[in-house]
């Protein structure tokens, strides 16, 4: 992924945010980077800007606006905005500096104070001299990738929790008297975006409950429907599909979203941004406030500002101001094709764990390249809070999603293998290919620095690849039968060899990783093709045991639990490398049982740590203890000490 080079640009004026019209006579203070403040003006009268924006609405006063006129307005407005931004010396300097960097996305955080400034479509800016891509739209030019988001000024920073398990609410409304909305197309796009994390089932009917755990759909929704849904479920993403409409409040024009008024007597109701924000940020029965991370307003004019004379802003502004970190909206009418592209691009990329700033840039370029989308690229407006640790949160979320995707693939392989016989097992092999490619890509994205954190991250990713190879080997071994038995067993042995070597490589990255070296020893103990090492395997055993014993004294309960899990396994392996003699079996079995009980005492009987350790000893009992009487006695003691769980254990939850 690209690094993000952030430029914060603030445009401010004196006085309240409302009650002022745009005027060339009004000076605005700009703050950018570490440079001194500068002063700019907007060379547009308020009514002139409104007229120009009206001509970008495809139809005005009942008459269609020609494509030529729309393009001319875009060019003229883009040039005006470009001239305004060119008068901010710090912005020009910072963009020039960013142009010399490689593999970087420039992110402009635009913060404005003044409702009249929110009317200005900064997103259509044409790059002036000194900016990348001179003469082209700055946000779609190909020289230097640039993304622009808006942000509301706040008293204190808004917390962002990006790394959450996704749960999507899709609410659409098509009450009587309004034209259809592309609900089916949007639902297909959302369903497709979620596909990598939907567990495989043999029939579509069996998959429906799995989808419903991740996607809630409100048909012809009312505001109360949205409020109830947000009160009972913690959604990470909310996708609203409806028409936008003007409404008059105190004689002033405002924009709202058209929802259904009532299911018993359906009718259109124009809901303003503040009412929608209150529904999205409702308080649940346990006292927690609903807080989606991102809200997509697939409605016309959701980012458009009505009269600047009254408090409040656009729908997107109000939702963002209420505490929603990311709001994706349109400041002009958006085509159906454009709204579908928005849904496909945003959710498929964000759910994969791409940086949302990069997704905004790619989304705008996709809209710009799609002739069907007209000027939807200019309509796209994004309000966003980007804390300093957002990149780290995105990386953590990408790891979560990758592991969850691999969990689903292994579950699919196991379920399919139960039904696959002979040639039918080829479909399972294709799943193995997908697992390997997913983890290969994940490993390739690991940090390359030489610090301890980067090394730990690389070790974890390499270890995940190793664990996958081991799991694949066991699945292959379990289904080695018939004419293909020898080939399947050979593939299983090759997977075990790869797993063993990867575990050793993981330990080489992080010498405190007792889990990786223990798995390396485990596979050397059970795999005929042992690895020749500079140290004897009995010495590696001593190293692993010493590290685990040290970490058993850790104050962190999670680290202690995993250390005891390693100790339980390493004691068993002592018989394989001559560290223990047969007459010590009873004592070692008692010691292993004690370690297993300690794990349950630290983390709980139904904890991930207990379940993962039990699964590992079940492998020894099933696959590797047939000719090892000491192992049989020790695994029996371990399994008796480890409580059984009725909950499933995701494969990547515990990667040994």
Where on the chain are the PLM-derived regions?
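Catalytic cores of nucleophile-dependent amide-cleaving enzymes
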Residues: 139, 143-150, 237-345, 570
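Caspase-like cysteine protease fold
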Residues: 136-151, 265-286, 290, 348-415
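Helix-turn-helix repeat elements of alpha-solenoid scaffolds
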Residues: 416-448, 487-502, 533-547, 587-593
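Boundary/activation segment at the start of structured domains
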Residues: 2-5, 117-179
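Eukaryote-biased recognition of C-terminal alpha-helical segments
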Residues: 610-655
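Non-catalytic, solvent-exposed interaction/assembly segments
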Residues: 1-133, 162
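Amphipathic alpha-helical repeat scaffolds of TPR domains
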Residues: 398-426, 452-483, 504, 508-529, ...
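A domain-level signal for caspase-like cysteine endopeptidase catalytic cores
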Residues: 113, 154-264, 310
């Amino acid at each position: 992924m690209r690094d993000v080079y952030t430029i914060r640009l603030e445009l401010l004026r004196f006085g309240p945010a409302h009650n002022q019209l745009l005027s060339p006579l009004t000076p605005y203070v700009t703050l950018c980077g570490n440079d001194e403040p500068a002063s700019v003006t907007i060379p547009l009268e308020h009514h002139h800007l409104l007229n120009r924006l009206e001509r970008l609405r495809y139809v005005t006063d009942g008459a269609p606006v020609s494509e030529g006129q729309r393009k001319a307005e875009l060019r003229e407005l883009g040039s005006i905005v470009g001239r305004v931004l060119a008068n901010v010396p710090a912005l020009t300097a910072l963009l020039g500096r960013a142009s010399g960097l490689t593999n970087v996305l420039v992110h402009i955080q635009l913060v404005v104070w003044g409702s009249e400034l929110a009317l200005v479509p900064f997103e259509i800016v044409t790059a002036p001299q000194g900016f990348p891509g001179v003469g082209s739209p700055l946000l779609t030019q190909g020289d230097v990738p640039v993304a622009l988001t808006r942000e509301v000024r706040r008293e204190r920073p808004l917390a962002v929790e990006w790394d959450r398990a996704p749960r999507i609410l899709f609410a659409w409304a098509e009450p009587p008297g309004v034209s259809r909305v592309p609900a089916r197309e949007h639902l297909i796009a959302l369903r497709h975006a979620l596909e990598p994390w939907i567990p495989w089932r043999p029939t579509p009917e069996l998959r429906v409950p799995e989808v419903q755990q991740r996607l809630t759909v409100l048909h012809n929704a009312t505001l109360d429907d949205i409020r109830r849904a947000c009160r009972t479920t913690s959604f990470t993403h909310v996708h609203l599909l409806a028409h936008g409409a003007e409404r008059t409040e105190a004689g002033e024009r405002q924009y709202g979203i058209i929802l259904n008024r009532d299911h018993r007597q359906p009718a259109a109701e124009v809901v303003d941004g503040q009412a929608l924000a209150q529904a999205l940020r409702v308080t649940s029965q346990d006292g927690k406030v609903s807080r989606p991370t991102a809200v997509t307003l697939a409605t016309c004019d959701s980012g458009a500002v009505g009269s600047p004379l009254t408090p409040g802003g656009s729908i997107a502004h109000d939702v963002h101001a209420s505490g929603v970190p990311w709001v994706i909206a349109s400041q002009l009418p958006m085509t159906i094709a454009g709204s579908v592209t928005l849904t496909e691009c945003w959710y498929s990329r964000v759910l994969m764990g791409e940086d949302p700033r990069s997704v905004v840039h790619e989304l705008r370029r996709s809209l710009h390249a799609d002739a069907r989308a007209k000027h939807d690229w200019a309509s796209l407006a994004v309000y966003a809070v980007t804390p300093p640790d957002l990149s780290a949160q995105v990386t953590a979320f990408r790891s979560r999603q990758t592991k969850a995707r691999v969990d689903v693939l292994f579950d699919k392989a196991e379920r399919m293998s139960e039904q696959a016989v002979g040639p039918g097992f080829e479909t399972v092999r294709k799943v193995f290919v997908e697992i390997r490619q997913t983890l290969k890509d994940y490993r390739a994205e690991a940090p390359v620095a030489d610090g301890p954190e980067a090394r730990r991250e690389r070790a974890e990713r390499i270890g995940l690849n190793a664990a996958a190879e081991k799991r694949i080997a066991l699945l292959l071994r379990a289904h080695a039968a018939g004419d293909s038995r020898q080939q399947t067993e050979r593939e299983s042995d090759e997977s075990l060899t790869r797993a063993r070597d990867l575990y050793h490589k993981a330990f080489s990255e992080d010498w405190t990783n007792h889990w990786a070296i223990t798995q390396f020893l485990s596979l050397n103990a059970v795999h005929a093709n042992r690895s020749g090492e500079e140290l004897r395997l009995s010495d590696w055993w001593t190293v692993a045991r010493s590290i685990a014993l040290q970490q058993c004294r850790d104050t962190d309960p999670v680290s202690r639990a995993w250390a005891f899990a390693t100790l339980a396994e390493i004691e068993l392996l002592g018989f394989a490398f001559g560290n223990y003699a047969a007459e010590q079996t009873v004592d070692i079995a008692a010691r292993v049982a004690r370690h297993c009980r300690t794990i349950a005492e630290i983390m709980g009987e139904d904890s991930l740590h207990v379940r993962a350790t039990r699964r590992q000893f079940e492998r020894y009992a099933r696959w590797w203890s047939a000719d090892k009487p000491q192992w049989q006695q020790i695994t029996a003691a371990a399994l008796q000490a480890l409580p059984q769980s009725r909950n499933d254990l995701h494969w990547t939850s515990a990667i040994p």
